[in-house]
């Protein structure tokens, strides 16, 4: 349905999720959580755990819960068993994991996933590697909820396998998703674009995945009937192991500048956090040798309730670990009040921090990004208009100057 090469592509990808990787883990300690494991926890040094690709993220979260720290991830050479079986434990039954512990790490000749090529040149921006008539057919590796009980709406984090193709992307780009089936006119559904929520190296760090942050669209039509978005509903309900038709990547407007000393102001509402998750993961979580962020990253994030804060634990952990380089500000509309006693929206946070934001924006190294619902734009413009007037400038003129300098970036929908 999607392309003449669909069957062949699907066949090549059928075993993608079974590729094996070796985690080197330190810091695991014996506890009630680790007592059920079939491999011993070392008192010192490293523990090595073999993990299939499709379970990498689950295993990362499990290791974190047990107090461990992953110091390296390496592909198991040839995706085959180790050359000897001595010291290899049975698969762990803890939390349904299909991982194994090994007595020895993978050969040192294997390239670790934290080793990366040099920074891409500015003109080396991948665009439309896969098009609607010949999409890439990937596999769903993960689909899990991002909001907590009591939240408004449904938001999912999805990760797709790219190992059987050559799709690559940069932080700030988007991919297209083609939902299966036909519309009410008998025509194939049109693709929908989604901002990429992972860095160029993917959530597993091996350059073989791409992730999205998707909210299920739901609204009332003129007849008062509840209508659900075709593509967002498809994505929120897709199962691990299912095929997914992907196009792209597209977009040059929202790219993260390569300058490690840049200041990055990010204004997001809801799933508009997606490109900024990619930015922040590259700045603070990956820590690659070819990119060491030294500037200030400031995220002002608008959400309706605390339960709707996406990636909350990761964001707050980064803010605590990098207080000199990352600032996190929430605008929680249904829980916080602005200075006038009304609901706290993102524009009110801009007004509260007017002087500091204005001073930052005068710096030619500062880039300002806005991503989220289109309805956020008027309020933001109003806040910046007042901000500019206080400093003797006209906002539209200053905004035009920043656009000309490629320092003002907007992606709303």
UniProtKB/Swiss-Prot annotation:
Catalytic reaction annotation: 2 reduced [2Fe-2S]-[ferredoxin] + NADP(+) + H(+) = 2 oxidized [2Fe-2S]-[ferredoxin] + NADPH
Annotated membrane topology: Peripheral membrane protein
Binding site for FAD: 192-195, 213-215, 219, 230-232, 271
Alphabetic keyword roster: Acetylation, Antenna complex, FAD, Flavoprotein, Membrane, NADP, Oxidoreductase, Phycobilisome, Thylakoid
UniProt PTM comment: Acetylated at the N-terminus; 6% of protein in CpcG-PBS and 12% of protein in CpcL-PBS is acetylated.
Membrane found in the keyword field: yes
Documented EC number(s): 1.18.1.2
UniProt xrefs under CDD domains: CYPOR_like_FNR
Molecular functions per Gene Ontology: ferredoxin-NADP+ reductase activity
Entry protein name: Ferredoxin--NADP reductase
Biological source species: Synechocystis sp. (strain ATCC 27184 / PCC 6803 / Kazusa)
Lineage of the organism: Bacteria, Bacillati, Cyanobacteriota, Cyanophyceae, Synechococcales
Gene designation per UniProt: petH
